[in-house]
């Protein structure tokens, strides 16, 4: 049995990308797009760089390759955004670059951003797993930028009493879920998500972020 049951609602929506949900994204990327023609000596770099910036959000969702819902906390989204904007602002502080340099740097920042988002989502997931019983944390859906939450059932209980309380809490949670309006309730992800052997109790003690990332990414 997987170490947790993640009860995230699954919503079909157009992909926007996690960074797109940040409050400064529109302002920042509008500036980046409007000043891209000043960053390269070679005119061919301009349309390539412009396309990279325009497709940034959709390409992010395509590259995440996560086997779990793309839900990120506001705190971690702020951390990712700060890192990305800092790299981008530094790149734009320079004058005109030699041919090929500017779009290559944009690709490097993009790849770094994808990695940061993956780790942010996975770290929160692992933290959630290390509780006993039902635990919830607030998130933003990277699919549609709406407020959401992740509810997990963790097996990290230290006594039979804690375990009994955890199981009762899970039963109450499921019972309350069944009472909700079918058209309004979120579908618990443990009904549709696969189990991940790397997250089972025998493997958790020595689980590193790198191992978890490998486990929770789709191939």
From Swiss-Prot:
PANTHER family to which the protein is assigned, alphabetical: IZUMO SPERM-EGG FUSION PROTEIN 4
Q: Which gene encodes it?
A: IZUMO4
Its main subcellular localisation, reduced to a broad class, is: secreted
Give the record's family classification. Belongs to the Izumo family.
Other remarks in the entry? Izumo is the name of a Japanese shrine to marriage.
Q: Which UniProt keywords apply?
A: Glycoprotein, Secreted, Signal
Q: List the protein's name.
A: Izumo sperm-egg fusion protein 4
Q: Which organism is it from?
A: Macaca fascicularis (Crab-eating macaque)
- Domain of life, source organism: Eukaryota
Question: What residue range is the signal peptide?
Answer: 1-15
Q: List GO terms (cellular component aspect).
A: extracellular region; nucleus
Q: Which residues are glycosylated?
A: 206
**Transmembrane segment boundaries:** none
In which compartments does the protein localize? Secreted
């Amino acid at each position: 049995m997987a170490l947790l049951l993640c009860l995230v609602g699954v919503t079909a929506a157009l992909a926007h990308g996690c960074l797109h949900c940040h409050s400064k994204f529109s302002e920042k990327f509008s500036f980046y797009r409007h000043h891209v023609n000043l960053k390269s000596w070679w005119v061919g770099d301009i349309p390539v760089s412009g396309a990279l910036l325009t497709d940034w959000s959709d390409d992010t969702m395509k590259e995440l390759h996560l086997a779990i819902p793309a839900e990120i906390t506001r705190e971690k989204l702020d951390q990712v955004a700060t890192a990305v904007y800092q790299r981008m602002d530094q790149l734009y502080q320079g004058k005109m670059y030699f041919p090929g340099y500017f779009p290559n740097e944009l690709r490097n920042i993009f790849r770094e951003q994808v990695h940061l988002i993956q780790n942010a989502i996975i770290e929160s997931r692992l933290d959630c797993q290390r509780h006993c019983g039902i635990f919830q944390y607030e998130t933003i859906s990277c699919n549609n930028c709406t407020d959401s939450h992740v509810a997990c059932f963790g097996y990290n209980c230290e006594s039979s009493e804690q375990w009994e309380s955890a199981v009762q809490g899970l039963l109450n949670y499921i019972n309350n879920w069944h009472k909700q309006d079918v058209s309004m309730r979120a579908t618990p992800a443990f009904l549709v998500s696969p189990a991940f052997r790397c997250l089972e109790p025998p493997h958790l003690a020595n689980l590193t972020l790198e191992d978890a990332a490998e486990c929770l990414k789709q191939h």
